[in-house]
């Protein structure tokens, strides 16, 4: 709750939102601890709560009618992503999660070098297995190979597909691949990270324009821990090619 303009009405609304989230989590048999916090602004409140509770994953939900650009991107996103290195997901669902038929994941070049790479792959493979829906990865050839290796090693039971996305600018070509009952996941990156690309700055506007009628998740990988090195991956790829 923003301490600068808090009121009894806003406090009650915040409590109702927490209770609604707790009910949804309870239906999925997920334990929830409800926390109300007063702070100077939303980003500061989230960042301090992450530290106090040692949160490892941050999920921010947007209202189904909200514009993803106006609701999150801007000062809030910049402050939050600078304030924590933990994995951040911005989610907007237009339909119940258990009715999704497919998860489409757009992966940028060099995403395999981020320290949170295996973590988010596991998230969505597990999600696909639980929901009984196919997980379809789109990436350039090198990155797609690393995704395939990881899925084969750790999540072989998950129904998956893999398609080449030669250029990140071709993201708009996915409009023909994503239906209303699909979830589109876009793996982004923090400014200055190894997989960051300046084209990410246009991403919110593109998603708002071309995928406004789709359920969306934008994920910023975990930067916590040791990043995967080029040397390590190149050595792995060399061994793989020789087998």
Question: Over which residues does each language-model region extend?
Answer:
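Structured cytosolic domains appended to multi-pass membrane proteins
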Residues: 1-146, 153-155, 161-175
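Local beta-strand N-terminus motif with an aromatic residue
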Residues: 55-56, 180-183
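Glycine-rich, Arg-bearing micro-motifs that act as flexible, cationic patches
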Residues: 62-79, 187-206, 221-229
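Short, conserved loop/helix-junction motifs that constitute active-site signature segments
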Residues: 128-131, 208-212
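A short, acidic, amphipathic alpha-helical segment used as a generic capping/interface helix at domain edges
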Residues: 146, 166-179, 195-208
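C-terminal functional regions that serve as terminal interaction/effector modules
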Residues: 183, 210-217
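Conserved small/polar residues in nucleotide/adenosyl-binding loops
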Residues: 231-240
């Amino acid at each position: 709750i923003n301490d600068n303009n808090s009121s009894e009405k806003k406090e009650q609304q915040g409590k109702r939102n927490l209770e609604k989230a707790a009910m949804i989590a309870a239906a999925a048999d997920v334990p929830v601890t409800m926390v109300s916090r007063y702070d100077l602004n939303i980003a500061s409140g989230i960042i301090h709560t992450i530290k106090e509770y040692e949160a490892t994953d941050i999920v921010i939900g947007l209202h189904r009618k909200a514009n993803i650009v106006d609701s999150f991107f801007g000062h809030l996103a910049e402050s939050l992503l600078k304030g924590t290195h933990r994995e951040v997901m911005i989610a907007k669902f237009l339909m119940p999660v258990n009715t999704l038929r497919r998860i489409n994941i757009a992966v940028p070049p060099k995403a395999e070098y981020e320290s949170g790479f295996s973590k988010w792959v596991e998230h969505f493979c597990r999600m696909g297995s639980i929901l009984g829906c196919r997980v379809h990865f789109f990436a350039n050839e090198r990155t797609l190979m690393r995704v395939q290796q990881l899925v084969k090693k750790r999540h072989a039971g998950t129904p998956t597909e893999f398609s080449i996305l030669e250029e990140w600018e071709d993201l708009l070509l996915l409009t023909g691949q994503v239906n209303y009952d699909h979830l589109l996941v876009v793996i982004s990156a923090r400014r200055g990270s190894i997989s960051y690309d300046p084209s990410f700055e246009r991403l919110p506007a593109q998603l708002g324009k071309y995928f406004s009628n789709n359920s969306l998740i934008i994920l910023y990988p975990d930067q916590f821990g040791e990043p995967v090195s080029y040397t390590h991956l190149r050595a792995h790829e060399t061994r793989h090619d020789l087998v």
